[in-house]
Regions:
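Catalytic nucleophile serine of serine hydrolases
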Residues: 102
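Extended, subdomain-level signal for the structured scaffold at the beginning of enzyme domains
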Residues: 1-94, 98, 107-118, 126-186
């Protein structure tokens, strides 16, 4: 299975790295997609670097099984590009998994997809989503049809597990893996 990861400058370091690594560990192919191919990206904390493997104008939603949208400043930069918004819309229309964390739902909002949907996001993004007609809940992981959303880095283990469970066709709540830090989970 192939996963598209939309990434721009200033991504939240762990919100890219944790789900990206978990997906690779599970045997998924993850393509980092940006505005341009070969662009060197740096997380806003400066701890992580990533290189875009493909340009947005060279990919189609049909090429992938799921979409990952990390947070940080990346979604704010990406939402200014109509090609990115069109890709997000096409992905949602396909009914395939869309997973967004923290500021990631800004791309869903920019694509005018949040009205009537239930989701979560970083606290400062939640009001914007509500104003656009979304039902926002403050929970670690929220599933609504083909969407999985999460709030913040503390939620990443549950977020990553929910993505993998969805890709594997499981609707059950994920059990913590051996060695997972579950202190952030109630």
């Amino acid at each position: 299975m192939k996963i598209a990861c939309l990434l721009g400058q200033g991504f939240e370091d762990s919100e890219f790295r944790v789900p990206y690594d978990r997906l690779l560990e599970e045997g998924y192919q993850v393509d980092v997609i940006g505005v341009k191919a070969g662009e060197e990206l740096t997380g806003y904390k400066g701890k992580e670097k990533a290189k875009t493997e493909k340009a947005i104008d060279g990919v189609r939603a049909d090429d992938y099984d799921a979409l990952l949208i990390p947070g940080g400043q990346s979604p704010d930069h990406l939402r200014a590009d109509k090609r990115v918004i069109d890709f997000v819309r096409a992905f949602d229309a396909s009914g395939k998994l869309v997973a967004a964390v923290c500021h990631g739902p800004q791309l869903l909002a920019a694509a005018h997809l949040v009205k009537g949907r239930t989701l979560t996001a970083w606290s400062t993004v939640q009001d914007d989503l509500k104003q656009m007609g979304a039902n926002v809940v403050d929970e670690e992981v929220v599933r609504d049809r083909n969407w999985i959303t999460s709030r913040k880095p503390d939620d990443l283990l549950a977020f990553s597990s929910a993505i993998i469970d969805s890709l594997e066709g499981s609707d059950e709540a994920p059990a913590p893996r051996k060695g997972d830090n579950t202190a952030a989970h109630p």
